[in-house]
Amino acid sequence: MVLIKEFRVVLPCSVQEYQVGQLYSVAEASKNETGGGEGIEVLKNEPYENDGEKGQYTHKIYHLKSKVPAFVRMIAPEGSLVFHEKAWNAYPYCRTIVTNEYMKDDFFIKIETWHKPDLGTLENVHGLDPNTWKTVEIVHIDIADRSQVEPADYKADEDPALFQSVKTKRGPLGPNWKKELANTPDCPKMCAYKLVTIKFKWWGLQSKVENFIQKQEKRIFTNLHRQLFCWIDKWIDLTMEDIRRMEDETQKELETMRKKGSVRGTSAADA
């Protein structure tokens, strides 16, 4: 058995703008999660072409320990809390697989994302068979809804309900911002449809861990997209060439940061 959820994140930007904004935000957020021997190591970031599909391939290693729940740390052997993330970004479609060498075939996280120019109203964009689709829970993430944010994660300067972009004049996002967006044809809009499939086969822990991971994925998607919108003035003028240069610099920074300093960023204890 696997646990599948589809997270839908609506944003007041275009699919084209989001491509740059998402890559910028992921690079910045990675720095906030790296230090003291933990965090993110980038092994590969290169173009790929496979069966007519073209895009950017990345292979990252997540060195975790304090970032997993205590009940997992207690039973996890030394060195087992290392996760490999491989992503094939053929934008506007992206596929990410997370695996663990210790658990082998008993664990994976698969995230498939379609980015569409709509307000999150499309059904089964990933083309699942009807029986599987019936089991999928749909979760709507509202980036302006503070109640969806963990108290420990809240930052006023990353709150779309307070932020207004100087360059685009977008924001602040009020309680009815999605309805207002639907009634404003000239304002860009899009939705990231993120299908998350989780398998964790460990007797006695399976449902507990699968539910924990889905909760963490929602938390990550919520925080990242709130940041993405509030950082729009930092990335809206960037090109993909600028982003690739930034990613190269970030890769070197992460390597240095991971080897020194203290553990940074979100921990499972906050969840």
Curated annotation (Swiss-Prot):
It comes from Rattus norvegicus (Rat). It holds the Pfam family IP_trans. Keywords: Acetylation, Endoplasmic reticulum, Golgi apparatus, Lipid transport, Lipid-binding, Membrane, Phosphoprotein, Transport. The gene is Pitpnb. CDD domains: SRPBCC_PITPNA-B_like. GO terms for molecular function: phosphatidylcholine binding; phosphatidylcholine transfer activity; phosphatidylcholine transporter activity; phosphatidylinositol binding; phosphatidylinositol transfer activity; sphingomyelin transfer activity. The keyword Membrane applies. The lineage of its organism: Eukaryota, Metazoa, Chordata, Craniata, Vertebrata. It is found in: Golgi apparatus; Golgi apparatus membrane; Endoplasmic reticulum membrane. PANTHER family: PHOSPHATIDYLINOSITOL TRANSFER PROTEIN (PTHR10658), PHOSPHATIDYLINOSITOL TRANSFER PROTEIN BETA ISOFORM (PTHR10658:SF27). Phosphatidylinositol transfer activity is inhibited by N-ethylmaleimide. One of its GO terms (biological process) is retrograde vesicle-mediated transport, Golgi to endoplasmic reticulum. The modification Phosphoserine is found at residue 262. This is Phosphatidylinositol transfer protein beta isoform. It catalyses: a 1,2-diacyl-sn-glycero-3-phosphocholine(in) = a 1,2-diacyl-sn-glycero-3-phosphocholine(out); a 1,2-diacyl-sn-glycero-3-phospho-(1D-myo-inositol)(in) = a 1,2-diacyl-sn-glycero-3-phospho-(1D-myo-inositol)(out); an N-(acyl)-sphingosylphosphocholine(in) = an N-(acyl)-sphingosylphosphocholine(out).
